[in-house]
C-alpha cells in the first residue's frame, strides 16, 4: 500500500513539469487520471528517440501507470465533464500557460466552489504574476532565465545547458512538495488551496548558493569548469 493510497489526482500536464509531478504522486500510491485534449494530446507523445525509432521516452517516463482519458476542455460540454471529474479528485495538476484554464472557466476559484478540498497545482515557466507571466516556455527557457546556462561548462565556452531536462524536473519536484504540503494542511484545516510553482523559481532554489554569493560579493558567478 502506497503512502497516497486513496488520493485521486487529475493530471492535465504537458511535457515534463506537470506530468512528472503526477508520476511521482502515482509512484507514491495515488490514482492518477491523465487528461489530454483531442488531436495531438500531450505533445510529449510526439518527441521520438529518432526519426527511425518512434518510441517516446519523454511521455513514457512521466506517465507510467496512469489512467487515460480524452476531454476537450475548450468546449462547454467537455469543460462540464471535466468539472464533474475534478469534483471527485483531491488534486489537479496542470502546467498550461498562465491564464489558459481560467479562460476555459476552469480556474481554482470556479473549481473550488464545488470541491473546496481541491489542491490546484499549477506549474509555469516564469510564475503566474509579474514580468514574463504571459510567456510560454519549457526546460531550456527555465535554465536560461535562471542563469544555469551561464555557469555550466568551461571558461570561453558559449552558454551551455545541462544535458538533462533539469529545470523541468526541479520544477516538478517543487510541485510535488507543494502538493504534499497542501494535502497535509488540508488534513488540519479541511480546506484545499492553490499551489503555484515555476521553472524559474526552481532554478533560483537550485542555485541558492550562487545567488547568495552574488548578493554578498556583487560578482556574477562564472563557469563552473566541471566543479561547484
Annotated model-derived regions:
Residues 1-39, 83, 88, 95, ...:
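Acyl-CoA thioester-binding alpha/beta core of soluble enzymes
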Residues 49-53, 136-141, 213-214:
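Short, hinge-like loop/turn segments at secondary-structure boundaries
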Residues 39, 125-127, 199-204:
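Glycine-rich beta-alpha junction loops
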Residues 54-113:
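A structured beta-alpha segment of the ubiquitous adenosine-cofactor-binding alpha/beta core
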Residues 27-68:
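Glycine-rich phosphate-binding loop and adjoining beta1-alpha1-beta2 segment
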Residues 94-153:
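N-terminal Rossmann-like NAD(P) cofactor-binding subdomain of oxidoreductases
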Residues 145-228:
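Acidic, glycine-rich segments within the central catalytic cores of soluble metabolic enzymes
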